C-alpha cells in the first residue's frame, strides 16, 4: 500500500524545511493568504532538493484572516485569481528547473469548493486551462473532485489527520467544537483508519466511508513536526509506502 503525505507550506512557519524531509508533496502558498515571491522561491528550492512534489496552494484574497474568511465571488473572478496564483508559482518552479505537479486550494476556498459546484468548476477550469496534466487535490468525495473529473483532470482525494469530520464527510468548521484534533494518538488512529480501512468516525459518532489518496498534515500546528515523524514511523511499521 502507498499513500501521499502532504503539507501546506510557505505560510511563514519555521518547520517548513524539516517537514520537507518527511512529506512527499508540498502545497506552497501563492501570496493571497500567506507567503510572497521570496518564500515561494525558498520553498520551491527546498522541495526540489528533497525530491518533494510541488503544488500550488491558491486562496481567496484574504491575508488578514489567513484565507479563512468566507467569500462570495463570481466564478469568473475565482477562475482568474486561481489562474494568477498557479501561474506565479509555476513560473518560479520552471525557472528552478522543476515541474509543478498539482494544485490544492487553501482554507475557505477549499471548503466552499467542496460544496459549491460553480466554485469547484471555476477552480477546475483554471487548472485545466493552465496545464491539464496537473493533479487537482480536493476533499475526498467533494464537488471539487467531481469538477476535476468533469474536466478530465487527474484528481487526488484528500483526508486530514488533525481535523474532525461531520457525518456527511465534510470537515467540522473551525468555529465549532471538534474541528481540530489536538491529541496525537487520536489523530494517528484516525489517519490509519482512513488509509487502511477507508472510513472515519464523525464527531457525532457516525462512521463515514472515505477514499484516502493523500493525507494532509498542517505545517502551522504546534506539534506538526513531531506528529509527522510519528505518522511516518506508523506508516513504515505497517508497510505503507509514502510517495507522491
UniProtKB/Swiss-Prot annotation:
GO molecular function: 5-oxoprolinase (ATP-hydrolyzing) activity; ATP binding
Catalytic reaction list: 5-oxo-L-proline + ATP + 2 H2O = L-glutamate + ADP + phosphate + H(+)
UniProt record similarity statement: Belongs to the LamB/PxpA family.
The UniProt record lists the keyword Glycoprotein: no
GO biological process, one term: carbohydrate metabolic process
Keywords: ATP-binding, Hydrolase, Nucleotide-binding
EC numbers for this chain: 3.5.2.9
Gene: pxpA
Domain of life of the organism encoding this protein: Bacteria
Coiled-coil portions: none
PANTHER family: 5-OXOPROLINASE SUBUNIT A, UNCHARACTERIZED PROTEIN YBGL-RELATED
SUBUNIT field: Forms a complex composed of PxpA, PxpB and PxpC.
Summary of the function given for this chain in its UniProt record: Catalyzes the cleavage of 5-oxoproline to form L-glutamate coupled to the hydrolysis of ATP to ADP and inorganic phosphate.
Stated name of the protein: 5-oxoprolinase subunit A
Amino acid at each position: 500500500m502507498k499513500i501521499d503525505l502532504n503539507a501546506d507550506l510557505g505560510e511563514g512557519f519555521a518547520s517548513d524545511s524539516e517537514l520537507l524531509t518527511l512529506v512527499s508533496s508540498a502545497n506552497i502558498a501563492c501570496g493571497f493568504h500567506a507567503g510572497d515571491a521570496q518564500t515561494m522561491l525558498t520553498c520551491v528550492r527546498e522541495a526540489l532538493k528533497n525530491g518533494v512534489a510541488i503544488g500550488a496552494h491558491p486562496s481567496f484574497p484574504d491575508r488578514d484572516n489567513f484565507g479563512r474568511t468566507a467569500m462570495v465571488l463570481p466564478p469568473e473572478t475565482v477562475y482568474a485569481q486561481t489562474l494568477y496564483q498557479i501561474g506565479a508559482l509555476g513560473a518560479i518552479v520552471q525557472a528552478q528547473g522543476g515541474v509543478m505537479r498539482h494544485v490544492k486550494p487553501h482554507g475557505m476556498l477549499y471548503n466552499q469548493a467542496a460544496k459549491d459546484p460553480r466554485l469547484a468548476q471555476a477552480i477546475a477550469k483554471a487548472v485545466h486551462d493552465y496545464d491539464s496534466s496537473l493533479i487537482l487535490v480536493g476533499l475526498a468525495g467533494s464537488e471539487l473532485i467531481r469538477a476535476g473529473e468533469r474536466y478530465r483532470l487527474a484528481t487526488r482525494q484528500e483526508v486530514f489527520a488533525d481535523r474532525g469530520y461531520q457525518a456527511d464527510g465534510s470537515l467540522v468548521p473551525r468555529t465549532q467544537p471538534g474541528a481540530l484534533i489536538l491529541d496525537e494518538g487520536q489523530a494517528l488512529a484516525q489517519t490509519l483508519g482512513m488509509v487502511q480501512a477507508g472510513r472515519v468516525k464523525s464527531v457525532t459518532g457516525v462512521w463515514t466511508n472515505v477514499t484516502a489518496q493523500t493525507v494532509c498534515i498542517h505545517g502551522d500546528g504546534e506539534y506538526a513536526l513531531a506528529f509527522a515523524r510519528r505518522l511516518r514511523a506508523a506508516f513504515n511499521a505497517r508497510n505503507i509506502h509514502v510517495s507522491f
